[in-house]
Amino acid sequence: MNNFFQGYNLLFQHSLFASYMDWFHSFNCSLLLGVLVFVTLLFGYLIFGTFYFKSKKIEYQFGELLCSIFPTIILLMQMVPSLSLLYYYGLMNLDSNLTVKVTGHQWYWSYEYSDIPGLEFDSYMKSLDQLSLGEPRLLEVDNRCVIPCDTNIRFCITSADVIHAWALNSLSVKLDAMSGILSTFSYSFPMVGVFYGQCSEICGANHSFMPIALEVTLLDNFKSWCFGTME
C-alpha cells in the first residue's frame, strides 16, 4: 500500500508508532480513493441512466439499504485501526524509564533530565561558520538532546514565554509548548540516529531559527555522554 502512494505519503518513519501512523494514513488514502471512484460512477449512472429508466417504475429500497450499509462499513474500517493506535499510544504512556523536560524559549530550547541531577543545558542553532562537514544548515544545534534507544522516554513540554511546538516529523511527534502548562507524552526509539525537527508554531521574528536535534544512541554511549556532559 505504501508503494502505491510513494511520493505522496509521510516521511520515512523511524519508530514503531510512527510506522503505524504511516500505515493508517495510507489506508485512509485507499479508502478515500475507493469512495471517490464509487461516487463518480454513481453520479454517472444517475445522470446517464436516467434517460433509460425514466419511463420505468423502480423501487429504490435496496439502493437505500446499500447507501446505509456502505458508509457504516467504511466508518468501521476506519474506527478499528484508529482505536488500536489510540490504545497502543495509551500503553506507551503507562511507564517510563527516563524523563526529559523540554522548555521552549525565544528562540532556543532547554533540556533538563529530571532523573539525572545536574544534567540540563540550552540548545541553540549553529551558525553557518560553526557548521562541520555534513551537518545540515538551519537544523544543527550546539547541544543535542541525547537519549538511549529501546527505552521508554517521557517528555514534558512547556514554554517560558510564548507558544512553541516541539515537532519531529520523521517520528510523528508534535506537541505544543505553552507557558504554565506541562504537556507530557512517552516514546520509545527502536533505532539509533540523529533526528531533526523545528518549532512548528509561529513564535516571533526568529521562529525559523530554533531547530530540534534529537540523538538516539546506545545505552552505554548515553551513560558516557551523561558523565562527560556533567564534568
Swiss-Prot record:
One of its GO terms (molecular function) is copper ion binding. It comes from the Eukaryota. Cu cation A2 binds at residues 199, 201, 203, 207. This is Cytochrome c oxidase subunit 2. It is found in: Mitochondrion inner membrane. Component of the cytochrome c oxidase, the last enzyme in the mitochondrial electron transport chain which drives oxidative phosphorylation. The respiratory chain contains 3 multisubunit complexes succinate dehydrogenase (complex II, CII), ubiquinol-cytochrome c oxidoreductase (cytochrome b-c1 complex, complex III, CIII) and cytochrome c oxidase (complex IV, CIV), that cooperate to transfer electrons derived from NADH and succinate to molecular oxygen, creating an electrochemical gradient over the inner membrane that drives transmembrane transport and the ATP synthase. Cu cation A1 binds at residues 164, 199, 203, 210. Mg(2+) binds at residue 201. It is a multi-pass membrane protein. Component of the cytochrome c oxidase (complex IV, CIV), a multisubunit enzyme composed of a catalytic core of 3 subunits and several supernumerary subunits. The complex exists as a monomer or a dimer and forms supercomplexes (SCs) in the inner mitochondrial membrane with ubiquinol-cytochrome c oxidoreductase (cytochrome b-c1 complex, complex III, CIII). Its EC number is 7.1.1.9.
